[in-house]
């Protein structure tokens, strides 16, 4: 019934003849190209700063977007998934440089990204993502801030934030100003969240109902500092970021096997993470043979320690990355050449992975037509990668490429037809795992004889503007050779379930449909967006790929008046998922309703105050996320409410 209501709403929106203000196409300049390459015609999402909740994980923030799901492991860990593709198939960037963390090797590891004070988040697919990073069969999620800026700050500010949520709080300080022709950026924030509440009747321990989820707490501190010097010849910038946090592991499979164990609260299972990142970025406009050269160097040391009752395991990732982007534009084409090198040392102690080293070397080229009634994009990428442990070695070379054709049919319809051939080198976990992974209570085994994973994706994107309504439809089919996945076995080792990294050919296909319209009500605006996405994932033996999210229907309303009042509502109806692998159980459908209100109060020309009041899952429905490794044992949070207060002084 809910699905029928959703489609009736779509029909109502399309035939409604109330006077409305046309929602024009917004040109978006993607930051992965530093020289203003327009990305607005691609299957692309942009989430602006005011839409982001810093108390949520990045996956939880993005899950309402079509084609995006959240692979959570409790409230702290939320890894974004694009069209069912997880791990390093979906690459997370910070200001165009890969984020150094351990999330790509396991679903219980947190993304090392700070969402405070960012400008926006952009999601890219197609030739753009192939050019920028290797193995991105899912796409790129790029988190943008101006900690290093190639332009002089025009929004100099001192800001204080306070927020409360989940029996906890958070606060943030931001100082951003240009002094002595130097951009100065300083951000300090911390967050402390307690165990979250769960809906009535969804969680029991030995027959006793639980109202909160043990070990769902999260504490984190972050400090970021940046200096940048913008000049006519280009710019130069440096930054330092430190992240230090602790988060609970809300599920430990071993507890199911124990008899007469203590109360759940007595089992303190948690992970400590710390990361230090140093970045140098710049651009030179006056160089022989090129229009400009962009360069970046990042040194990042990420430390993760899993604490359990029977000991601890330490996993490190010490990464050095270097990149040069050359602008070769001429009158007929926009062209880029990228040289990239990354070396990662991963010392491990007591972990299910051996110590290892990874080398990634790549050469990429991007071309786009100019001044034509159509646009053709092409990206090619050559990679030479190696993964070495003390006793095992793996190496390969690969070629990835993608192309797209975009054009108008009449004045109302625009289409983009694209094809991408993407090769992905296996990760160190997929190759070398051999031991007990405590957080998931599995004995994982890798395979260093794996072949490269190769995806071939064809996609049609259509954008149609009719009677002040914007329609967007994406159709895609992704055939993947040697798809790598973790398969649970029926045997055990050392009391843990055996889990083997395996390969099979697979096909993922689906669609994404969205419709939006802005209504002018007096002098106020009401933005209405409806969307639906659906995906299927099947192996060549007609079994299902694990943890493929079910069909999702979304309604978003945003009402803004002339008095700086903003009201918003986000409603998600996730359908049941019965297309499951042999290691999964069926996931029931659910409703998820979030609401909020924000008010900006201008105190004078220099000071303003912003209030934001919000509620998540206000219907207090039981929500189990099919994309999660632990959905059967860890429900999502019940109804919870929060307040953000921000005082801003503009210089």
Where are these regions (language model features)?
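N-terminal periplasmic "start-of-domain" segments of outer-membrane beta-barrel proteins
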Residues: 25-53, 79
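Short acidic/polar hinge/loop motifs at secondary-structure boundaries
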Residues: 98-125
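A beta-strand signature from Gram-negative outer-membrane beta-barrel systems
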Residues: 115-157
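Periplasmic-side early beta-strands and strand-to-turn transitions of outer-membrane beta-barrels
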Residues: 142, 150-153, 157, 177-271
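C-terminal beta-signal and adjacent terminal beta-strands/loops
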Residues: 194-196, 423-424, 480-482, 486, ...
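Flexible loop and strand-edge segments within Gram-negative outer membrane beta-barrel domains
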Residues: 214-220, 234-293, 297-319, 346-350, ...
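Outer-membrane beta-barrel signature, preferentially recognizing the C-terminal barrel domain
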Residues: 259-287, 393-394, 408, 421-480, ...
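Gram-negative outer-membrane beta-barrel transporters
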Residues: 332, 369-373, 475-480, 497-580, ...
């Amino acid at each position: 019934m809910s699905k029928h209501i959703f489609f009736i709403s779509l029909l109502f929106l399309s035939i409604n003849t109330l006077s409305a203000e046309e929602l024009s196409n917004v040109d978006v300049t993607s930051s992965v190209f530093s020289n203003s390459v327009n990305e607005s015609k691609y299957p692309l999402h942009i989430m602006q700063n005011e839409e982001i909740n810093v108390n949520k994980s990045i996956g939880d923030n993005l899950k309402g977007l079509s084609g995006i799901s959240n692979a959570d492991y409790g409230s702290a860990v939320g890894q974004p998934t694009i069209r069912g593709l997880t791990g390093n198939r979906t690459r997370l960037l910070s200001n165009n440089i890969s984020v150094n963390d351990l999330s790509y090797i396991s679903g219980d590891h947190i993304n090392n990204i700070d969402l405070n004070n960012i400008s926006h988040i952009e999601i890219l697919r197609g030739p753009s993502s192939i050019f920028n990073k290797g193995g991105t069969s899912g796409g790129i999620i790029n988190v943008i801030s101006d900690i290093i800026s190639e332009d002089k700050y025009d929004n100099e500010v001192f800001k204080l934030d306070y927020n409360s949520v989940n029996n906890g709080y958070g606060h943030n300080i931001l100082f951003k100003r240009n002094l002595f022709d130097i951009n100065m950026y300083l951000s300090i924030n911390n967050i402390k969240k307690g165990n979250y509440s769960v809906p009535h009747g969804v969680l029991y321990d030995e027959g006793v109902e639980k109202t909160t989820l043990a070990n769902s707490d999260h504490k984190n501190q972050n400090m970021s500092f940046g200096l940048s010097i913008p000049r006519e010849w280009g710019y130069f910038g440096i930054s330092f970021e430190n992240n230090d946090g602790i988060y609970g592991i809300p599920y430990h499979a071993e507890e199911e096997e124990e008899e007469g164990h203590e109360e759940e609260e007595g089992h303190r299972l948690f992970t400590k993470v710390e990361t230090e990142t140093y970045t140098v970025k710049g651009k030179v406009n006056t160089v022989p043979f090129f229009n400009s050269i962009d360069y970046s160097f990042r040194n990042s040391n990420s430390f993760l320690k899993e604490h359990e009752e029977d000991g601890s395991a330490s996993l490190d990732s010490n990464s050095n990355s270097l990149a040069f982007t050359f602008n070769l534009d001429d009158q007929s084409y926009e062209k880029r050449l990228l040289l990239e090198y990354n070396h990662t040392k991963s010392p491990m102690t007591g972990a299910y992975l051996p110590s290892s080293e990874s080398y990634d070397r790549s050469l990429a080229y991007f071309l786009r037509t100019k001044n034509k009634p159509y646009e053709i994009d092409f990206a090619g990428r050559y990679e030479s990668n190696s993964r070495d442990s003390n006793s095992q070695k793996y190496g390969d070379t690969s070629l990835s490429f993608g192309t797209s054709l975009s054009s108008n049919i009449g004045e109302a319809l625009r289409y983009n037809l694209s094809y991408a051939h993407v090769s992905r080198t296996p990760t160190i976990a997929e190759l070398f795992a051999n031991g007990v992974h405590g957080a998931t209570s599995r004995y994982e085994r890798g395979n260093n004889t794996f072949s490269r994973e190769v995806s071939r994706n064809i996609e049609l994107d259509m954008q149609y503007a009719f009677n002040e309504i914007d329609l967007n439809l994406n159709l895609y089919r992704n055939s993947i050779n040697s798809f790598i996945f973790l398969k649970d076995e029926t045997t055990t080792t050392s009391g843990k379930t055996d889990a083997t990294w395996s390969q099979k050919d697979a096909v993922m296909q689906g669609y994404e449909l969205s419709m939006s319209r802005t209504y002018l009500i007096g002098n106020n605006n009401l933005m209405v967006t409806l969307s639906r996405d659906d995906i299927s994932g099947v192996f060549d033996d007609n079994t299902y790929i694990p943890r493929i999210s079910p069909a999702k229907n979304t309604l978003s309303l945003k009402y803004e008046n002339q008095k700086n009042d903003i009201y918003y509502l986000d409603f998600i109806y996730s359908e049941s998922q019965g297309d499951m692998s042999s290691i999964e159980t069926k996931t029931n459908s659910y409703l998820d309703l979030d609401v909020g209100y924000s008010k900006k109060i201008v105190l004078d020309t220099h000071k303003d105050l912003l209030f934001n009041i919000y509620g998540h899952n206000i219907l207090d429905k039981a929500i189990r996320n099919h994309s999660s490794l632990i959905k059967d044992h860890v429900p999502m949070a019940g109804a919870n409410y929060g307040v953000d207060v921000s005082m801003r002084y503009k210089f």
